[in-house]
């Protein structure tokens, strides 16, 4: 139990406090303008009266404080400590997938747009964010119809004898083949940037002036092109919802029900709503701390920082946060809690999105519970299969043999439970022996019962199931249900003289005949999805190992490439395909690769290409 007499000894300076349990485990990390006032608020009468505080305080045995010079330093330190220690009661966004953005380097000879994950301070222009690669690709697809920018690296384009297919589709202007002047191409680049920035009024005004000028000078084909472009832009813009008069903003909304907290972030770019993202979290503490922690964590990542961030409630450290964001961005960014007007309406809209996301999650959980209950009943399992693990083996005639483990919790993939296994003890194509090794290693590596799944599924028939039950028996694992899922088979109907496909079959220990689940039933679809995911996870790892050997063998044929330089090339580019797509200058920019060797690498990888090399 924490000694409250220590509260008066705490400094009144800004800093970070770490709440620890009796075993020294860090339970919570927070920041404060005044450490004494902030920590005292947890242990005073007001703090003890709040349910969300009582449960944390009861577990605190010690409070460690770290003094900083400014609130901004406290923000940075808090984020660093949370990422390092992952305290149980702090907001946890570590499973959050990175957003996608469009990047355009204006210093390139003919700038093009690429889809990237990380926003860097490298002088390039960034547009977005987009919540998925698919939405980013769709944005690019629309943009190419309006502004036919090049699609591929210049080195790739110039190796071809003729323009690419996108030129024939009028979605590329083929600058690499001189079919558009640099000045005209620069006009396309500027137009695309204005369009992505949401500055459509300026863009349309410019194009109308150019159309009028072309018509006045009897350049009617040029005027017609501008006319068609103006119409296409107007049609596209009509589909986008205008929510403010202009500018970029991120709008945060919040909705809480008990310990379930939902946050929704709306992305406003150029005054238009371009997307949103929801975060569903288990959070017991105050909403203000949730908002503050979320903003600090989210914007510490390599993401786009807008002109302003609108929040649903007052945040004590908003000034320090605004200063930190402005410093990271290189331009002023404000953090505001609007009380009225259009911006307050946007915050309210974000709150509605947060509530809708929580409702959707609750419905999914109710549906998952029903599916798991039905699965338990149909397979006569001892446990409700909240945690299901599935295993698969992948190899080609015993080469590059690997195993995979995927984990699903409450019907959803739990990526933290995924594992790859390189087969170590089996020679030749013996899938049963490989499965035995993988399962044995899984339970030897984590013998604690609290780490065991409720159900293990193996991909295969009765033979694979026998291996699973043998391993469980050998290692005295008694609290795990077992099953195998055999794929459907093609069967011949001799009477009808036709081929039919059998249903998926579930084999269980102690049963001679498999259980046949109703086709397209929710339990069968869940098992099939888990089995297919295990297969995908195994085969991609197998292909990766084969690919590494392929890369090694190809690069080893190039004079001057040894293990160190090969490793550096792979670290820099990631794959043989990307090494092959790289230009000479990009290869030469790789550490330990001089220009002469870069030239040799480029020629070796392109010696069979058609057409003249540049």
Curated annotation (Swiss-Prot):
UniProt GO molecular function: DNA binding; excinuclease ABC activity
Annotated SMART domains: GIYc
Gene Ontology CC terms: cytoplasm; excinuclease repair complex
Domain GIY-YIG: from-to ranges: 12-91
Residue stretches spanning the membrane: none
UniProt cross-references to InterPro entries, sorted A to Z: GIY-YIG_endonuc, GIY-YIG_endonuc_sf, GIY-YIG_UvrC_Cho, RuvA_2-like, UVR_dom, UVR_dom_sf, UvrABC_protein_C, UvrC
Transport listed as a keyword: no
Pfam families recorded: GIY-YIG (PF01541), HHH_5 (PF14520), UVR (PF02151), UvrC_RNaseH (PF22920), UvrC_RNaseH_dom (PF08459)
Cysteines joined through disulfide linkages: none
Record keywords: Cytoplasm, DNA damage, DNA excision, DNA repair, Excision nuclease, SOS response
Record-annotated UVR domain positions: 201-236
Location relative to the cell: Cytoplasm
NCBIfam families named among the record's database cross-references: PRK00558.1-5, uvrC
HAMAP family for the chain: UvrC
Function: The UvrABC repair system catalyzes the recognition and processing of DNA lesions. UvrC both incises the 5' and 3' sides of the lesion. The N-terminal half is responsible for the 3' incision and the C-terminal half is responsible for the 5' incision.
Family named by the database record: Belongs to the UvrC family.
Protein name as it appears in the record: UvrABC system protein C
């Amino acid at each position: 139990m924490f000694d409250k007499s220590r509260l008066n000894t705490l400094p009144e300076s800004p800093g970070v406090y770490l709440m620890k349990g009796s075993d020294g485990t860090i339970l919570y990390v927070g920041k404060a303008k005044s450490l004494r006032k902030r920590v005292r608020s947890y242990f005073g009468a007001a703090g003890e009266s709040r349910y969300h505080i009582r449960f944390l305080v009861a577990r605190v045995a010690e409070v460690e404080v770290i003094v900083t010079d400014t609130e901004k330093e406290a923000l940075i330190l808090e984020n660093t400590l949370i990422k390092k220690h992952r305290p149980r009661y702090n907001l946890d966004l570590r499973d959050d997938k990175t957003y996608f953005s469009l990047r355009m380097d204006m210093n390139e000879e003919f700038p093009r747009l690429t889809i990237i994950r990380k926003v860097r301070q490298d002088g390039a222009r960034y547009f977005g964010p987009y919540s998925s690669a698919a939405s980013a690709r769709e944005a690019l697809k629309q943009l190419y119809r309006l502004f036919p920018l090049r699609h591929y690296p210049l080195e790739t384009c110039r190796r071809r004898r003729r323009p690419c297919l996108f030129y024939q589709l009028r979605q590329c202007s083929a600058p690499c083949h001189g079919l558009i002047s640099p000045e005209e191409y620069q006009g396309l680049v500027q137009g695309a940037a204005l369009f992505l920035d949401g500055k459509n009024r300026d863009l349309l005004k410019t194009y109308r002036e150019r159309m009028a000028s072309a018509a006045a000078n009897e350049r009617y084909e040029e005027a017609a092109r501008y006319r068609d472009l103006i119409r296409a832009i107007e049609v596209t813009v009509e589909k986008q919802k205008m929510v403010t008069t202009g500018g970029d903003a991120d709008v945060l909304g919040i909705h809480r029900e008990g310990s379930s907290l939902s946050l929704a972030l709306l992305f406003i770019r150029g005054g238009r709503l371009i997307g949103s993202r929801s975060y569903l979290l288990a959070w017991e503490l105050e909403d203000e701390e949730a908002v503050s922690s979320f903003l600090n964590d989210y914007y510490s990542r390599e993401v786009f920082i807008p002109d302003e961030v609108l929040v649903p409630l007052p945040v004590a450290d908003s000034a320090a946060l605004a200063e930190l964001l402005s410093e990271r961005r290189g331009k002023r960014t404000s953090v505001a809690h609007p009380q009225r007007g259009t911006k307050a309406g946007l915050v309210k809209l974000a709150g509605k999105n947060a509530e809708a996301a929580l409702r959707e999650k609750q419905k999914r959980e109710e549906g998952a519970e029903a599916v798991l209950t039905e699965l338990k009943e149909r397979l006569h399992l001892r446990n409700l299969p909240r945690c299901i693990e599935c295993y698969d083996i992948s190899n080609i005639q015993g080469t590059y043999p690997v195993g995979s483990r995927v984990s699903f919790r409450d019907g959803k993939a739990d990526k933290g439970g995924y594992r790859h296994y390189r087969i170590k003890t089996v020679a030749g194509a013996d899938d049963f022996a490989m499965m035995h090794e993988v399962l044995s290693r899984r339970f030897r590596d984590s013998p604690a019962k609290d780490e065991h799944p409720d159900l293990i599924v193996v991909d295969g028939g009765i033979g694979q199931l026998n291996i699973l039950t043998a391993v469980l028996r050998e290692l005295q694992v008694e609290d795990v249900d077992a099953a195998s899922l055999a794929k459907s088979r093609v069967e011949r109907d001799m009477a009808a003289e036709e081929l039919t496909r059998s249903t998926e079959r579930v084999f269980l220990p102690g049963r001679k005949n498999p259980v046949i689940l109703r086709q397209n039933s929710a339990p069968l679809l869940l098992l099939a999805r888990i089995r297919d995911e295990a297969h995908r996870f195994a085969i991609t790892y197998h292909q990766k190992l084969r690919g590494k050997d392929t890369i090694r063998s190809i690069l080893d044929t190039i004079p001057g490439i040894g293990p160190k330089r090969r490793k550096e090339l792979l670290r820099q580019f990631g794959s043989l395909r990307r090494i092959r797509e790289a230009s000479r200058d990009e290869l030469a920019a790789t550490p330990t690769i001089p220009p002469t060797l870069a030239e040799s690498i480029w020629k070796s990888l392109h010696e069979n290409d058609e057409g003249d090399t540049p």
